Amino acid sequence: MTEPNNTDLLDLATPYALHAVSIDERFEIDRWLATAPPEVADAFTDEVRSVQETMAVLSAATATEPPAHLRDNVLAMVADDPVRDLGSARRRRGGESRWRTAVLAAAAVAVVGLGALGVGLALRPAVSPTTADQVFAAPDVQTVSGPIPGGGTATVVFSKERDAGVLVMNDVAPPKPGTVYQMWLVGSDGPHSAGTMDDKAISPSTTAVLSDIGTSQALAFTVEPPGGSQRPTSPAFAELPLT
């Protein structure tokens, strides 16, 4: 493996997290991390943690280990980026690694397919799991992740072409009694409700399909009264860009 620059090193975080590198390659990556700038090493660690947490969605949602074929499917998706050539990899989609897009999309779709939507989310009418499959396979599939105040992360795998997305929330605390989390698809004409989550809907790993994302520029989260609101009544406590 050719010694990477800092951007290339971050591209190696997902195959590293998936144990999709050889022992020798893992040793080389560890050596490069030891001499990398602190901010790069921290970003690498955060990326590894994010991938591992997302893969853990499968076991949390089904009380079983992730299907053995999932890792093979992810690796097959990126077969044109061989591990031994990752030193020449480049960030794609404005900084989004194809490895990371593949694993996050695969994990989210696998969860939906295994029935993780049966958590009682008060979303708009349920969308067939095939919608998630279409998002996963879409040529314009993208992922975006961000921290949730108070702990946990939210990830959206989405496709504007398929007009849908898959939301995965890891280790997010439930709303306080007497309140709900409400999701909003935010576009040029303002926010539109994408559903609510009460304390019973939130689990260590919560997954939902988002439909009709249209030209929405962001997915925002607010705290609202039970049943939700027609318009946000509090500032967004988290927001993920959908552009």
Curated annotation (Swiss-Prot):
Transmembrane segments: 103-123
Any one GO biological process: regulation of translation
Extracellular side: 124-243
Segments on the Cytoplasmic face: 1-102
Location of the region described as Disordered in the Swiss-Prot/TrEMBL record: 223-243
Chief location bin: membrane
Domain remarks: The cytosolic domain interacts with sigma factor SigK.
Protein function: An anti-sigma factor for extracytoplasmic function (ECF) sigma factor SigK. ECF sigma factors are held in an inactive form by an anti-sigma factor until released by regulated intramembrane proteolysis (RIP). RIP occurs when an extracytoplasmic signal triggers a concerted proteolytic cascade to transmit information and elicit cellular responses.
UniProt name for this protein: Anti-sigma-K factor RskA
Gene name tied to this protein: rskA
